[in-house]
From Swiss-Prot:
Pathway(s) where this gene product acts: Porphyrin-containing compound metabolism; protoporphyrin-IX biosynthesis; 5-aminolevulinate from L-glutamyl-tRNA(Glu): step 2/2
A single GO molecular function term of this UniProt record: pyridoxal phosphate binding
GO cellular component, one term: cytoplasm
Subunit composition and interactions: Homodimer.
Entry protein name: Glutamate-1-semialdehyde 2,1-aminomutase 2
Organism of provenance: Bacillus cereus (strain AH187)
Catalysed reaction equations from the record: (S)-4-amino-5-oxopentanoate = 5-aminolevulinate
SUPFAM superfamilies, per database record: PLP-dependent transferases
Superkingdom assignment: Bacteria
Main location: cytoplasm
Length: 429
């Protein structure tokens, strides 16, 4: 049995200092019934907690660390920038370098604005969509999480799903009434919403792969249908690629599925592990953003040189060949997890998109939030705790996916499959 004495003591102290002892709810490990692990360091595919336990990491800071922890090139870039100054409140050339890479690789982006978080990116994109169209309502999907902006914290997933909250107290009814929610992968409901409110719907915002109800890919024709419906009704299509951006493919989720939105939100990978976000799209739309247009958005640390340098060094290391290797590794892990579950007769459903994998303990195909909620949460919690004992660090929520990095080796994946085999053998009915 692993010892967690130092993590337990640190969490006891933290609960007097921060709400729930953490700075983001899912980190409290509540849904898996254990004390949170306090991490000390990471290198490559491994993390080490303050009690000295080693884990193969599939959290990767919730997705950003696509090259694993403390990537040499990213670390050297950060050192070089920090020695010259960490922030100036003025433009720097590294902003141009990262912007060029983003524009080159993301089909929908002709102009991009850097911000500080994924939430900031989605909030800014909504304001832009409303300002550009002159409309008020937005359409989002039940269980899709787009950050904690008021307009988007309606029937959201992620930590909200983990905590069992349908919304959040503090979101005014006047804000909520302008957010239309329908089931993910349900194109007919989208069409019906446009029949009812089409003249006032500014945009549809969607994760190309729903990553905050587990991992739920789009059904064939769903994204294409959204593109068609929005174009027919004069609304903008926004892809929230904070999670899928540069994660599922070289050209992001929109390249992977061949559907080009009007606006795209980015985060996570483009900051290489530092706080970052971005939104971009067609030039005619983005030029409405201040100072070139009237739609205001600003940020003290937007385009921070540390985040820009980490993001640039992260992206330049990603090539089309990187994603071929991601696919191979992810297929290997997916097959191994499926084989272990089948061997022990454990109800399961595994979804995957590129290097994102979601395992649900249910017999039901998971194509939307209602299906995701059919998972056996008690079994997941027990499985999670056993995987920790086996030295595997997974996201502490049924409603989050696993992430792979370029640092994960075949040996890591084989060890993870072996750990899952042990865990499932102990937990089978």
């Amino acid at each position: 049995m692993k010892k967690f004495d130092k993590s337990i003591a640190a969490f006891e102290e933290a609960q007097d200092l921060m709400p729930g002892g953490v700075n983001s709810p899912v980190r409290a490990f509540k849904s898996v019934g254990m004390n949170p692990l306090f991490m000390e360091r990471g290198k490559g595919s491994k993390v080490y907690d303050i009690d000295g336990n080693e884990y193969i990491d599939y959290v990767l800071s919730w997705g950003p660390l696509i090259h694993g922890h403390a990537n040499d090139r990213v670390v050297e870039a950060l050192k070089a920038v920090a020695e010259r100054g960490t922030s100036f409140g003025a433009p720097t050339e590294i902003e141009n370098k990262l912007a060029k890479l983003v524009i080159e690789r993301v089909p929908s982006i002709e102009i991009v604005r850097m911000v500080n978080s994924g939430t900031e990116a989605t909030m800014s994109a909504l304001r832009l969509a409303r300002g550009y169209t002159g409309r008020n309502k937005i359409l989002k999907f039940i269980g899709c999480y787009h950050g904690h902006g008021d307009s988007l914290l309606i029937k959201a997933g992620s930590g909200v799903a983990t905590l069992g909250l349908p919304d959040s107290p503090g979101v005014p009814e006047g804000v909520a009434k302008n957010t239309i929610t329908v089931a993910y992968n349900d194109l007919e409901s989208v069409k019906y919403a446009f029949e009812q409110f089409g003249d006032d719907i500014a945009c549809v915002i969607v994760e190309p792969v729903a990553g905050n109800m587990g991992v739920v890919p789009p059904q064939p024709g769903f994204l294409e249908g959204l593109r068609e419906v929005t174009e027919q009704n004069g609304a903008l299509l926004i892809f929230d690629e904070v999670m899928t951006g540069f994660r599922v493919a070289y050209n992001c989720g929109q390249g992977y599925y061949g559907v080009t939105p009007d606006l795209t939100c980015l985060g996570k990978v483009i900051g290489g592990g530092l706080p970052v976000g971005a939104y971009g799209g067609k030039a005619e739309i983005m030029r409405q953003v201040a100072p070139s247009g009237p739609i205001y958005q600003a940020g003290t640390l937007s385009g921070n040189p540390l985040a820009m340098a980490a993001g640039y060094e992260t992206l330049v290391q990603l090539t089309p060949e990187s994603y071929v290797e991601f696919e191979r590794k992810a297929e290997m892990l997916e097959a191994g997890l499926r084989k272990a579950a089948e061997k022990h007769g454990i109800p399961h459903h595994i979804n995957r998109a590129g290097s994102m994998i979601g395992i649900f303990f249910t017999d039901e195909p998971v194509i939307n939030y209602d299906a995701a909620k059919s998972s056996n949460l008690e079994f997941f919690a027990a499985y999670y705790r056993e995987m920790v004992e086996q030295g595997v660090f997974l996201p502490p929520s049924q409603f989050e996916g696993l992430f792979l990095s370029t640092a994960h080796s075949d040996a890591d994946i084989e060890a993870t499959i072996a750990a899952a085999e042990i865990a499932m053998s102990k937990l089978k009915a």
